[in-house]
Amino acid sequence: MAKEKTTLPPTGAGLMRFFDEDTRAIKITPKGAVALTLILIIFEIILHVVGPRIFG
């Protein structure tokens, strides 16, 4: 009789996992990124309108 061949699940078959290690970078949620972007856009608009009066 032939031996039964056991196979491993294909989920991790030699693929690199990029998120296994914890990095020391700043972690921000997608909502936080959108909020910071909107704040930056509003700040730029305010500087564009009011800036010439303040900075000459």
UniProtKB/Swiss-Prot annotation:
Bilayer-spanning residue ranges: 30-49
InterPro entries membership: Preprot_translocase_SecG, SecG/Sec61-beta/Sbh
Primary localisation category: membrane
Keyword Methyltransferase annotated: no
HAMAP family in alphabetical order: SecG (MF_00751)
Subunit-level organization: Component of the protein translocase complex. Heterotrimer consisting of alpha (SecY), beta (SecG) and gamma (SecE) subunits. Can form oligomers of the heterotrimer.
Protein name: Preprotein translocase subunit SecG
